[in-house]
Amino acid sequence: MTSPDADSAGLAAYALALGDDALVLAQRCGEWITNAPQLEEDVALANIGLDLLGQARTLLTYAGEVDGQIDGQIDGKGRTEDDLAYLRDERSFTNVQLVELVNGDFAATMARLLAFSTYQLALYEELQHSADPTLAAIAGKAVKEVAYHRDHATSWVLRLGDGTELSHERMQAGLARAWPYVGELFDASWVAPGLIEQGVAVDVRALETGWRAYLDDVLAEATLEVPDVAQRPGGGRRGIHTEAMGYLLAEMQHIHRSHPGARW
């Protein structure tokens, strides 16, 4: 059910972008299965990936149900989650670039997870009060999941940052790798005019101060420094992605595209 005053095309695009964030990061988390440094961590990252995949499914399903423009075609109603996950090309995905970056080492993965989950938790805490009842319900369910994701990443950043000389160095390098992409998290220019004013979408610009305060506290406790690096121009919300995105989609979409219409 959509909110009566929301622009349908804008609402569909908003749900789709949030779903793409979750879907792409779920794919990256899944790449750690059988590769994590501990068996317990293998399970933890698999569960985080499954949480994100669940969020992606509900958001993509909702985007497909909303009348409007999705992927350049009028009337997106009736598109399934599978259609949106597997049958769009790279330029049609609108996730932030941060989530698509190649995992790197474990410290780099935890740095990205900390940055993104802190943002996502703040986003969902606000979105659960959305004027759109479906978005509010999706966010309300996801808040507890994402709080765990943030806590898990926080514990590892503290452990690695304030651990050995090598772990500290790796953690600092992981932060420097992710940091050029965090600015895009707080870009609200892509959201359809009116959705924020109607209370449907969250104005992410208002989340940045709290996000930075949390990250500053964690990094200080971990004896790490906030990276002094320039921000990338971004563009993921408009379909402009890093080189890594094409490879990720090729792997994720291969089976579905190779056997269209197959039933398992």
Model-found features: residue ranges?
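Acidic/His metal-coordination segments adjacent to aromatic residues that form catalytic metal sites
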Residues: 1-14, 87-112, 163-164, 178-201
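Alpha-helical scaffold segments that form or flank carboxylate-/histidine-based iron centers
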Residues: 10-15, 36-55, 109, 134-146
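Extended, helix-rich structural scaffolds rather than catalytic motifs
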Residues: 169-264
